Swiss-Prot record:
Composition bias, Polar residues: 1-11
PANTHER family for the chain: UBIQUITIN-CONJUGATING ENZYME E2
Annotated stretches, region: Disordered: 1-44, 260-293
Alphabetized UniProt keyword annotations: Apoptosis, Cell membrane, Cytoplasm, Membrane, Protein transport, Transport
GO biological process, one term: apoptotic process
InterPro entries: Ub_conjugating_enzyme (IPR050113), UBQ-conjugat_E2_core (IPR000608), UBQ-conjugating_enzyme/RWD (IPR016135)
Protein name: AKT-interacting protein
Limits of the UBC core domain: 75-223
Length: 293
C-alpha cells in the first residue's frame, strides 16, 4: 500500500471523527458515507466564483505556422531549402536568384529581359519571405531601382505580388511562381488597379510616350548595374565590367563544355535532334551511317 495514500486516508478519518462532536460535547450524526469503492465529489458551494487556471507554458510554445517552437526554425529552414531546390529545377529563363548569407528569408535576384517593350533591361531585385513561411502572406519582391511599370510602386520599387497571389496557400504556391510572375509582367502589361497610375494611363492612351519612358527606365536601371549592392551581404548579386583576365577563362570553359561526337555512341543521353550534326545548326546535316552486315 502506498504510504502517502494511507496517511492521507487516515488523517481524513480522524478529522471526520473529531467533527462529529461539537464544542459543547453534543453528539452530531455523521453524514452518510458512500458505498465502498465509489468516489463522490463534494457539492459546489453557493455563490462560488470559478477559478480559471493559468495557461500552461507548453501551450504557448506553438508557433504561428502550427509547428512546435522547439523545432519551428528547423521546419522553416527545410521549407526554404525545398523552395530553392524547386527554383533550380524549374530553370526559369532569364532569372537568377541567390539566398542571402545573413538570412534565409531574403533572396537576391536579377531578371534579364530579352525582347518586348523592356528589351535589354537588367533588373535587380530582392525577395523578402515572411518569418512564418509557408503559412503567412506571400513573399514580397522589391526592385533595387523602381521600374516604370503599372504594377511597380514608383517610390519603393515593390511589385504588386498580391494581384497574382491573393491568398498564399502552402503546398500549392511556391516561390518559383512568384519569380516567374515577376518576369511575366514585363511581357504582359496589366493596367487594372495599378501601383503606378501614370504608367497605366500612358499605356492605355499614349503608347508612344509610354515606350519612351520605358526606354528611359531601362537605361536608368542599367546605369546602376555596376553599383555596390544596397544591402551589405557577401551573397548579394553584383556586376563588374568585362575583365579578360578574369572572365575570358570562364567563357572558354562554358563554350568548351560540348559533347564529343564519339560520346553519342556510348548510350549517354543525347541533347538536340538526331538529324543535326554535332557542332552544326544546319538541319539534316548529319550523314547517315550505312548499316554494317
Amino acid at each position: 500500500m502506498n504510504p502517502f495514500w494511507s496517511m492521507s486516508t487516515n488523517a481524513g478519518r480522524k478529522r471526520s471523527d473529531g467533527e462529529e462532536q461539537s464544542g459543547s460535547g453534543e453528539q452530531r450524526a455523521s453524514p452518510a458515507r458512500p458505498p465502498f469503492g465509489k468516489k463522490q465529489l463534494p457539492s459546489i458551494p453557493k455563490n462560488a466564483v470559478p477559478i480559471t487556471k493559468a495557461a500552461s507554458p507548453a501551450s504557448s510554445t506553438q508557433s504561428a505556422n502550427g509547428t512546435h517552437a522547439s523545432y519551428g526554425p528547423f521546419y522553416l529552414e527545410y521549407s526554404l531549402l525545398a523552395e530553392f531546390t524547386l527554383v533550380i529545377k524549374q530553370k526559369l529563363p532569364g532569372i537568377y536568384v541567390q539566398p542571402s548569407y545573413r538570412s534565409a528569408l531574403m533572396w537576391f535576384g536579377v531578371i534579364f529581359i530579352r525582347h518586348g517593350l523592356y528589351q535589354d533591361g537588367v533588373f535587380k531585385f530582392t525577395v523578402y519571405i515572411p518569418d512564418n513561411y509557408p503559412d503567412g502572406d506571400c513573399p514580397k519582391v522589391v526592385f533595387d531601382t523602381p521600374v516604370f511599370h503599372p504594377l511597380v510602386d514608383p517610390v519603393s520599387g515593390e511589385l504588386d505580388v498580391r494581384r497574382a497571389f491573393t491568398k498564399w496557400r502552402r503546398n500549392h504556391n511556391h516561390i518559383w511562381q512568384v519569380l516567374m510572375y515577376a518576369r511575366t509582367i514585363f511581357y504582359k502589361i496589366n493596367t487594372m488597379e495599378p501601383l503606378n497610375p501614370e504608367a497605366a494611363v500612358l499605356y492605355d492612351k499614349d503608347i508612344q510616350l509610354f515606350k519612351s519612358k520605358v526606354v528611359d527606365s531601362v537605361k536608368l536601371c542599367n546605369s546602376h548595374l555596376f553599383d555596390q549592392p544596397k544591402i551589405d551581404d557577401p551573397y548579394a548579386i553584383s556586376f563588374s565590367p568585362w575583365n579578360p583576365a578574369v572572365h575570358e577563362e570562364a567563357k572558354e570553359k562554358m563554350f568548351a563544355h560540348k559533347r564529343r561526337p564519339e560520346d553519342f555512341n556510348k548510350g549517354l543521353p543525347v541533347s538536340g535532334l538526331s538529324w543535326v550534326k554535332p557542332g552544326s545548326t544546319q538541319p539534316f546535316s548529319k550523314e547517315d551511317n550505312p548499316l554494317q552486315t
